[in-house]
A protein has these predicted regions:
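Inhibitory N-terminal propeptides of secreted protease zymogens
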Residues: 19-100, 149, 295
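Mature extracellular/periplasmic domains of secretome proteins
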Residues: 142-148, 253-259, 275-297, 306-324, ...
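Subtilisin-like peptidase catalytic core
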Residues: 151, 158, 171-173, 177-304, ...
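Structural recognition of the beta-strand scaffold that forms the well-ordered cores
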Residues: 24, 56, 81, 152-155, ...
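C-terminal subdomain of the subtilisin-like protease fold in secreted/lumenal serine endopeptidases
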Residues: 45-46, 280, 289-300, 307-312, ...
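Protease zymogen maturation seam
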Residues: 72-152, 160, 165-166, 184-194, ...
Length: 483
């Protein structure tokens, strides 16, 4: 059976705020009705009901600044901010980023690939044995420690292909915040004919020897000599309005690759065109924290701090949930959120030669760790596989790694993760550096953590072993000053 493999370059970032009349209001339960009535607001939906109530509200006034000033001056209000619209673009054009890794090796690995058993499912060998896993010494770590992951990783993204053969055994029920309904299937964004065509192995939308780019905006980034571009005549399967379809499934596949016995909770806060609202992301964080998530993986960022987002982050941290966020693809030393919030593990992208990816944001204010983010092969809807570039695909490596730590040290708190994973390959301006799972996890187990793998014999222990030891790996002398 032939399966298509695609190249994907993406990270969630915020669009500039436009004039709007929707806001996120936070007030105590005893004051919220008074605030709404006093300022002529209309409640659209409740985002969270706890010590404070968080509401999505609207105002009939088009004067955004005036409404903000008026409501924020009310002493009964905890916070008040405009709703933000977010999107899932390709690598940010502001950096004119170029990829340092040739796609030739990726293409070569797709030809004549074999199928292998991986913890109860059959997957392509180039998924379990690839450059990214070799760099972080995943296979060596798994062999030495028998750690395969525990707990639940909630992924806030575009959903997931709940029927993907590699993922069905580890997915737990999620929620679709874009439709306000249980379940988080990415295929719900497709019309039935398109969904059926995607899952056909003989659809013939491309030659099996080619690798695709889903969005023409990436043409300037990817090498023309090694990349097949999606022909416009084939867009009846996945048209341009669905440019970010598959992103959530790709993130889920990376978590599963690192931590194959951890469970995954897909939370759909983004549409297939990459659009979302800040209110849905806030709801998703609260939902994850209240519904058993051990880790929340967030491959998105916004450029301005948000009181509502920060409150949701703090709530999750208070419930001992580990939060991981992509650092952004602007190629800048800048702050983005939630990666720059205290307690959040901000993840940058590194290359196959252990340098900072050209597109990755950097600096101690936004990056706690780096992980490979170029040419990472992972799952894609329809039982397919794809290769991705971007900090979107670095973040889930750390999310998976966090569950390995939790398996060895079940009582670990969010801050402990930083310490236990800090035996790294140092990279300038990339926090503690590029994660080294063998160095960190063997140190963890040997220092007294108990390892009790739930699935030591349930499948291949692949995730490639490095053929050379990383002599420069080791704890950094002083970590980053993360805000």
């Amino acid at each position: 059976m032939r399966k298509r493999t695609l190249l994907f370059v993406a990270l969630l970032t915020a669009l500039p705020l436009a004039a709007q009349s929707s806001y996120i209001l936070t007030a105590s339960p005893s004051n919220v009705q008074s605030v709404v009535d006093s300022h002529g607001l209309t409640v659209v939906k409740e985002l969270f009901d706890g010590t404070n109530c968080v509401m999505l509200v609207t105002s009939p006034s088009a004067n955004v600044t005036g409404v903000e000033t008026e409501v924020e001056s009310d002493l009964k209000v905890v916070s008040f901010e405009p709703q933000q619209n977010l999107s899932l673009p390709e690598l940010n054009g502001a950096t004119q980023a170029t990829l340092t890794q040739s796609t030739t090796g990726i293409l070569d690995s797709l030809v004549g690939r074999t199928l292998v058993n991986f913890f109860g499912s059959t997957v392509p060998s180039n998924y379990t044995t690839q450059t990214a896993t070799s760099i972080i010494r995943l296979g060596d770590a798994r062999t030495a420690t028998n750690l395969t992951g525990t707990g639940v990783v909630a992924i806030i993204d575009t959903g997931a292909d709940i029927n993907h053969p590699a993922l069905t055994g580890v997915l737990v029920p999620g929620y679709d915040f874009t439709r306000d309904t249980p379940g988080a299937s990415e295929l719900a964004d497709l019309n039935p004919a398109m969904a059926a065509a995607l899952q056909q192995s003989t659809t013939g939308i491309l030659d099996a020897q080619n690798t695709l780019v889903l969005n023409a905006a990436a043409v300037a980034i990817l090498s023309q000599s090694t990349t097949g571009i999606l022909d416009q005549s084939t867009t009846g399967i996945l048209d341009s309005t669905l440019s970010e379809f598959g992103h959530g499934t790709m993130v889920a596949g990376i978590v599963h690759l690192i931590a194959p016995t951890a469970k995954i909770m897909p939370l759909k806060a983004f549409h297939a065109d990459g659009s979302s609202d800040l209110s849905d992301i806030i709801r998703a964080i609260y939902y994850a924290a209240d519904n058993g998530a051990s880790v929340i993986s967030m491959s998105f960022s916004i450029s301005q701090p948000s009181p509502g987002l920060q409150a949701a982050v703090q709530y999750a941290l208070s419930k001992n949930v580990i939060l991981v966020a992509a650092s952004g693809n602007d190629g800048l030393k800048t702050l983005v959120y939630p990666a720059s919030y205290g307690g959040v593990q901000g993840i940058g992208s590194s290359t196959s030669s252990d340098t900072k990816s050209n597109f990755s944001n950097f600096g101690s204010g936004v990056v706690t760790f780096a992980a490979p983010g170029e040419g990472v092969i992972t799952t894609y809807p329809g039982g397919n596989y794809a290769a991705g570039w971007g900090t979107s695909f670095s973040a889930p490596m750390l999310s998976g790694a966090a569950t390995l730590v939790l398996q060895a040290r079940p009582l670990s708190r969010p801050g402990d993760i930083t310490n236990w994973l800090s035996k790294t390959k140092q990279i300038s301006d990339m926090g503690y550096g590029r994660i080294d799972l063998f160095a960190s996890l063997t140190n963890l187990v040997n220092s007294g953590g108990s390892s009790s793998s739930t699935s030591s014999t349930s499948g291949s222990t692949s995730g490639s072993s490095s053929t050379t030891t990383n002599s420069t790996s080791g704890s950094t002398s002083g970590g980053p000053s993360h805000p």
